[in-house]
Curated annotation (Swiss-Prot):
Cited function: Specifically dimethylates two adjacent adenosines (A1518 and A1519) in the loop of a conserved hairpin near the 3'-end of 16S rRNA in the 30S particle. May play a critical role in biogenesis of 30S subunits.
SMART domains assigned: rADc
Binding site for S-adenosyl-L-methionine: 18, 20, 45, 66, 91, 112
Alphabetized InterPro entries for the sequence: KsgA/Erm (IPR001737), rRNA_Ade_diMease-like_C (IPR023165), rRNA_Ade_Mease_Trfase_CS (IPR020596), rRNA_Ade_methylase_Trfase_N (IPR020598), rRNA_adenine_dimethylase (IPR011530), SAM-dependent_MTases_sf (IPR029063)
Catalytic activities: adenosine(1518)/adenosine(1519) in 16S rRNA + 4 S-adenosyl-L-methionine = N(6)-dimethyladenosine(1518)/N(6)-dimethyladenosine(1519) in 16S rRNA + 4 S-adenosyl-L-homocysteine + 4 H(+)
Name under which the protein is recorded: Ribosomal RNA small subunit methyltransferase A
Lineage of producing organism: Bacteria, Pseudomonadati, Pseudomonadota, Gammaproteobacteria, Alteromonadales
Record EC number: 2.1.1.182
Ranges in coiled-coil conformation: none
């Protein structure tokens, strides 16, 4: 049998499917998620139910968002899950997660995410950060390193700044390729993201922060002065106490917010 087949389902490359099969890893992830009935529990990409089943066992209802129609049909017919699942068939990148929030209950979101959409999906979920208690995701290890990176490191970039603006980021565990079917060509890791109730450095317009960080990191080897010359003058850099000769990966989240707020105030 092909190593891409698991429980009778053939993994689809276009959906980035790698199914988690290691029971020990599954138990550790479920322990980190800590399922409960006090939150709206939401799984993105439930696949063949490796996390879905143990999470649903301890709660009354689980909401899932799945793109693959074949997998949706399997979930609808699942003997123990079908009565507990609220299934949304569709693309998580376009899904309005705010519709899942119930009065007085925030979301806990989790999933073994398709690696080909993990970065854009992070940016999409940050839009709903105020309605989310926490998130636990299996990601490519490289992406977890980027999410949790410190200024001055190679992994530090636009994703780092936006993730750490919205959330506390905590790596949970590393997961080797043999924990999946089919085995991915990269190492994986689980990360916990906890959105701030009160942001340490509030930005007056998050879209401006996103635009500024994108512009700054477009040319990583160039200086801030070079990359942001159409947005911030040398005098303004000096007023903020920011060295304009530094490269974008040397600037803290707090400093990026300060620059974005300055640009907003000039409008």
């Amino acid at each position: 049998m092909s190593n891409k087949v698991h429980l009778g389902h053939t993994a689809r490359k276009r959906f980035g499917q790698n199914f988690l099969t290691d029971g020990n890893v599954i138990n550790r992830i479920v322990g980190a998620i800590a399922p409960d009935n006090d939150h709206v529990m939401v799984e993105i990409g439930p696949g063949l139910g490796a996390l879905t089943e143990p999470v649903a066992n301890g709660i009354d209802k689980l909401t899932v968002v799945e793109l693959d129609k074949d997998l949706v049909e399997r979930l609808k017919e699942h003997p123990t899950l079908k009565h507990k699942l609220d299934i949304h068939q569709g693309d998580a990148l376009k899904f309005d997660f705010s519709q899942l929030v119930e009065e007085g209950r925030q979301m806990k979101v989790f999933g073994n995410l398709p690696y080909n959409i993990s970065t854009p999906l992070m940016f999409h979920l940050f839009e709903f950060a105020e309605q989310i208690e926490n998130m636990h995701f299996m990601l490519q290890k490289e992406v977890v390193l980027r999410l949790s990176a410190s200024p001055g490191t190679k992994a530090y970039g636009r994703l780092t700044v936006m993730a750490q603006y919205h959330c506390q980021v905590m790596p949970v565990l590393e997961v080797p390729p043999h924990s999946f079917t089919p085995a991915p060509k990269v190492d994986s890791a689980v990360v916990r993201l906890v959105p701030y109730k009160t942001k340490p450095w509030p930005c007056k317009d998050v879209d401006q922060l996103r635009h500024l960080t994108t512009t700054a990191f477009n040319m990583r080897r160039k200086t801030l002065r070079n990359n942001l010359k159409h947005m911030i003058s040398d005098e303004e850099f000096a007023a903020l106490g920011i060295d304009a000769t530094l490269r974008p990966e040397q600037i803290t989240v707090q400093q990026y917010v300060a620059m974005a707020n300055l640009v907003i105030d000039k409008k």
